[in-house]
Amino acid sequence: MRTADWIKKKAHEVVYNAGTNNPMKICEENGIYVCHQNLGRAFLGHYTNIKRIPLITLSAQNNEFEDNYACGHELGHHYCHHGNNTEWLSRNNLRFNTMGSEYEANLFMVNIMLEGVDFSEFETKEQLFKSCGIPLWAERYVDFN
């Protein structure tokens, strides 16, 4: 299990090296393939490796907002080295995880998407999250200190 500090440092490193905190652009900069498939409405995305080639599959039914955070979540699986045995990100499992690979992936997602953002520029958490493309259910993963 990775620590929250390790994940935050890794997210900073990834954003710094890619020159962006946009999950889709991070994939592009790092040779991580992203494709869209018909996964139905229940699933948002999945991460896997095919012959050591990283691949993020996003649902063709996702909107742009869902693609963005699902991609960030799946990047968490890639950079936290979870391998191929991760859960599919589903609309039904967007609950708060306190440990394990889903917790780490969610923590990584919010850390890359908030990297370099000055929280004081926003009056409410909702404004901050909307501006950064983070879903409200992910608030519990954000360290506001």
Task: Give the residues covered by each predicted segment.
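Active-site hotspot residues in diverse enzymes, especially metal/ion-binding acidic/histidine motifs
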Residues: 1-145
